[in-house]
Amino acid sequence: MLEKQKGIIIKSVDYGESDKIITILNEHGAKIPLMVRRAKKSKTGLQAHTQLFVYGLFIYNKWKGMGTLSSVDVINQYYDLRLDIFNSSYATLCTEAIERSMDNDDISPFHYKLLHFVLEKISNGDSAQLMSIIVLLKCMNRFGFTAFFNHSAISNSYDQSKLVAYSFVYDGTILESELYKDPHAFRISNKTLYLLDVLQKLPIDKMNQFNISQEILDEMSELILLIYKEYAGMYFKGQKLINQLKRIEY
């Protein structure tokens, strides 16, 4: 049976000498694995069309088990995004987080909307690092944990102007006057905590212009990745490449 699915490639794995298995996140929010025969042979025309981030109409044969890709009508390859290695790496982190946050039989239209949103934003010049932060914030609960940035985990005070650190002892933000209770709390600027709270709660269709300093973006990334590591034991391959690139840059 011939099937047609509009979607975005979120995973691509080599299979044997010439084939690969891709996973698309379709417009309904379902993960669809597909076998691509002779994908690594340039004569088939599928090599460029079965890479990560490709957005298109995927036509495939489906009987039992995994479908076999026949052709792709490409809508957007996000070519400009690929030209910048940092943008590409952060986009990889976004797709990795979204893919890992979903079980194989999950259906989540929001995840498709989120992925399409961040790829469009990165392609149009918005900060790829910020987009990765947004994805990690929005996917937290799918990994079985959450974090809050708007009140004290100790006193329950909602005076955000006095929040200065994130405590893994108390599982939340704490006030400056409470630092003595956890001397090893992760110190972070009040503005960063405020913006994390805003981004966590703001629907993506309400997000328009962004103007956040690099210093704050770096603080956000460091804390969010630490939260994923501490609460879920997770580390992302995309972040490993970003760290390597930053070491080379400096």
From Swiss-Prot:
GO terms for cellular component: bacterial nucleoid. One of its GO terms (biological process) is double-strand break repair. Involved in DNA repair and RecF pathway recombination. It comes from Staphylococcus haemolyticus (strain JCSC1435). Belongs to the RecO family. This is DNA repair protein RecO. InterPro entries: ARFGAP/RecO (IPR037278), DNA_rep/recomb_RecO_N (IPR022572), NA-bd_OB-fold (IPR012340), RecO (IPR003717). Keywords: DNA damage, DNA recombination, DNA repair. Pfam families: RecO_C, RecO_N.
